[in-house]
Amino acid sequence: MIKFDLTNRVAIVTGGAQGFGLAITERFIEAGAKVVIWDIDEDAAKKALDKVNSENLSYQIVDVSNFEIINKNLIEVESKHGKIDIFINNAGIAGMNTTVAEYPIEEWNKVINLNLNSVFYC
């Protein structure tokens, strides 16, 4: 495996409490980064903290489909850690498994807000 050094780098990983996001979080911690998980699932975030068990890992409960919440939390991360060096925009959802004709508009808006708008917001 290629080794890389992220000592004293600050990273935010959206959706960082599970799946690919957690794998990225773990690798960044191993490389020396300070990582802040942004996730909407507090239980999963707490489990990630317990699993990784590093003083360089913290989390914030952030709905990345909400521009105001993103800005508030960015300010908090910057005030605690300084400059943000790495931002991994990993949060996303698959939505429902149904036809377009049967797809509820509320669900469509939720998927678009999280998978598309949040990328622009972040």
Question: What kind of feature is each model-predicted range?
Answer:
Residues 4-35:
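Canonical Rossmann dinucleotide-binding motif of NAD(H)/NADP(H)-dependent dehydrogenases/reductases
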Residues 33-47:
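Conserved glycine-rich Rossmann-like NAD(P)H-binding loop of the short-chain dehydrogenase/reductase
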Residues 42-43, 61-74, 105:
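The beta1-alpha1 cofactor-binding region of Rossmann-like NAD(H)/NADP(H)-dependent oxidoreductases
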Residues 85-86, 109:
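Conserved catalytic-site loops of classical short-chain dehydrogenases/reductases
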Residues 91-96:
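Conserved NAD(P)H cofactor-binding loop of Rossmann-fold oxidoreductase domains
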Residues 98-100, 107-109:
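Substrate-binding pocket helix/loop in short-chain dehydrogenase/reductase
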